Design a protein with these regions (language model features):
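Adenine nucleotide-associated cytosolic modules
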Residues: 1-268
Length: 268
């Protein structure tokens, strides 16, 4: 059991006051280990809110440096950070918000060679990318390792997210394989409203905190979508497919795959 300091009691007082969280829930948060893949549009708000909440360890995977075009939506990075590795920039902001948080940085591409080794160290994974090959890689690695994760994706004015727990519908239950190269425009080609990243990222952060505290109902077997133009939110039921190639009763995928695909630079 954590022996809370007076500073921690004050820092997390608004959580502790919640009947559904309390001291016990905050302790679970502070003992949690979360991996955020991508320190970009989605990874930025996720990391900031999880750090503020007191997540014990946050791992960040990103192989890119901050670009001026990132600053329109990637709020964890500042103008002074242009040219700096995103993991370094993100770590600096996380520690500034909450020095209690331990930060693990991975300045590398997540791929089939390292995904399982990295993911196994964490309790919950957040997909903060907008890159189809990596999304399928995260899904497959988490299913293989029995890890829960939050999927998120945004483009133009739209966003979508769902949460996977072992035994529930996975990304491949919805989308069997990545689309053909060039079939879906990237964010650098189609654009994205900056605030959309914050809208979806904070939902992913909330799902992460709900997972550790056991609050409410997670977005399992449901895909939440929204259109910021109309501010309409929809929840679409998603069934776990027994024939799914990775999580079905007779999986046909027994190793991780590095798909080739034009990548959206939202996470870059």
């Amino acid at each position: 059991m954590i022996d809370f300091t007076e500073e921690q009691i004050q820092r997390y007082s608004r959580h502790i006051l919640l009947q559904d969280v309390g001291v016990e829930g905050q302790e679970k948060i502070m003992n949690a280990r979360v991996l955020v893949v991508g320190a970009g549009g989605l990874g930025a708000p996720v990391s900031l809110y999880l750090a503020a909440a007191g997540i014990g360890t946050i791992g960040i995977v990103d192989a890119d440096v901050v670009d001026l075009s990132n600053l329109q939506r990637q709020v964890i990075h500042f103008t002074k950070d242009v040219g700096v590795p995103k993991v370094k920039s993100a770590e600096e902001k996380i520690k500034a918000i909450n020095p209690d948080v331990k930060v693990d940085t991975y300045y590398e591409v997540l791929d089939s060679a390292n995904a399982l080794d990295i993911i196994k160290e964490y309790d919950f994974i957040v997909d903060g990318t907008d890159n189809f090959p990596v999304k399928f890689l995260i899904n497959d690695a988490c299913v293989m390792a029995g890890k829960p994760f939050s999927h998120g994706g945004i483009l133009r004015f739209n966003g979508q997210t769902f949460t996977h727990l072992p035994g529930t519908a996975c990304y491949r239950c919805m989308f069997k394989e990545p689309p053909p190269v060039g079939a879906v425009p990237t964010c650098s080609q189609a654009g994205v409203l900056g605030a959309i990243a914050g809208m979806l990222g904070t939902i992913q952060a909330a799902e992460t905190l709900k997972y550790f505290t056991g609050i409410g109902e997670l977005l399992t077997n449901r895909l939440l979508t929204f259109d910021a133009k109309t501010m309409q939110f929809r929840t679409v039921p998603v069934k776990h497919r027994d024939s799914c190639a990775i999580c079905g009763s007779n999986p046909t995928i027994d190793h991780l795959i590095d798909y080739e695909q034009a990548a959206c630079d939202l996470h870059k």
